[in-house]
Amino acid sequence: MASVRLFFTLISFVFIISTSVYESKVLDPPHVAESFNVSLIQKLGNTCAYTVIISTSCSSTRYTRDQISVAFGDGYGNQIYAPRLDDPSTKTFEQCSSDTFQINGPCTYQICYVYLYRSGPDGWIPNTVKIYSHGSKAVTFPYNTYVPESVWYGFNYCNSASDSNVLAIGLRRSVIILLGFVVAGTTLLL
């Protein structure tokens, strides 16, 4: 009976640890990209199409005159830059709305970062940025916060790729240890 209790305690421990590590990686807030430079964006190789859906928060102003640009890419230096997505005549980035953009750029692997650039007086607030790319799963970046003026602001999970490998190795070890306890517990029960 004690081994069964130990077994369930270990399962709970592994679940709690893996969930807290996962949440800390996924829920990092957006940040100012101090070293991000658009002039470093590559325009070499094949061209691929991307669908970018930017939803504006219901907390944002009713409409915006702000100039909005987006840059995104993968962990291998493949970057896409789209200047001036805003267009007041077509009512882009209105409060509680979603705007879809077709953007062409270098082909990438899995998108792992996105930055928005805002310039203007209105203080636009994006809700989410969702990017669909060729051959990769769609990725959503949850903003729901004010984008500071005249800085690149967003998410960079590219450096987390190695963290996910560490997490996978750690979980694999936990499963092996857990299986060891199961075998030991089963042996004790026999």
Curated annotation (Swiss-Prot):
<protein>
    <recommendedName>
        <fullName>Embryo-specific protein ATS3B</fullName>
    </recommendedName>
</protein>
<comment type="subunit">
    <text>Interacts with EULS3 (via N-terminus).</text>
</comment>
<dbReference type="GO" id="GO:0005576">
    <property type="term" value="C:extracellular region"/>
</dbReference>
<feature type="signal peptide">
    <location>
        <begin position="1"/>
        <end position="24"/>
    </location>
</feature>
<dbReference type="InterPro" id="IPR010417">
    <property type="entry name" value="Embryo-specific_ATS3"/>
</dbReference>
<dbReference type="InterPro" id="IPR036392">
    <property type="entry name" value="PLAT/LH2_dom_sf"/>
</dbReference>
<comment type="function">
    <text>May play a role during embryo development.</text>
</comment>
<keyword id="KW-0964">Secreted</keyword>
<feature type="domain" description="PLAT">
    <location>
        <begin position="48"/>
        <end position="158"/>
    </location>
</feature>
<dbReference type="Pfam" id="PF06232">
    <property type="entry name" value="ATS3"/>
</dbReference>
<dbReference type="GO" id="GO:0000325">
    <property type="term" value="C:plant-type vacuole"/>
</dbReference>
<keyword id="KW-0325">Glycoprotein</keyword>
<feature type="glycosylation site" description="N-linked (GlcNAc...) asparagine">
    <location>
        <position position="37"/>
    </location>
</feature>
<keyword id="KW-0732">Signal</keyword>
<dbReference type="GO" id="GO:0009536">
    <property type="term" value="C:plastid"/>
</dbReference>
